[in-house]
């Protein structure tokens, strides 16, 4: 749900030179605007097999093998599903979660954006992982290993 209280109703026009990004990167794909219209983000290719996210002309510091599914959380943070060394996870404002999976998809948010969930697959098991603002995992079902405080623990 969009928080209309955070909108800047006074600004008449804001220009973000999105077209200029083409000259700064190999290519630009999947542009995605924030719900309040203040930010535009896109996946950018910086070199062969190296991708970043660019927000209002500023690139994330971290580089990833692949990136997709840009989404702004209700609290304004930008998330992306990212791949590092063939394993997938979620990056929030450029910082990747520690836990990696065979695949990840369908990022979802709590109403206030404090909790982020993503569907994941690991070793032919499918589940949903949810993470709160303190970094603790709230749910992890269907794996041979349990996640506690963001770390895998043998059962």
Which role does the model predict for each range below?
Residues 3, 10-51, 61-71:
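Beta-strand-rich domains and repeat architectures in extracellular enzymes and scaffolds
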Residues 16-23, 57-63, 94-100, 134-139:
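A short beta-strand motif characteristic of beta-propeller blades
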Residues 24, 37-41, 76-78, 113, ...:
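Long, low-complexity, acidic Ser/Pro- and Gly-enriched intrinsically disordered regions
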Residues 24-32, 64-74, 101-113, 139-153:
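Repeated scaffold domains used in trafficking and secretory/extracellular systems
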Residues 41-48, 80-86, 117-125, 155:
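Beta-strand C-termini and the immediately following turn/loop, strongest in propeller blades
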Residues 46-47, 58, 92-95, 122, ...:
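Beta-rich carbohydrate-recognition and catalytic domains
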Residues 119-126, 135-138, 142:
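Eukaryote-skewed repeat-based solenoidal scaffolds used as protein-protein interaction platforms
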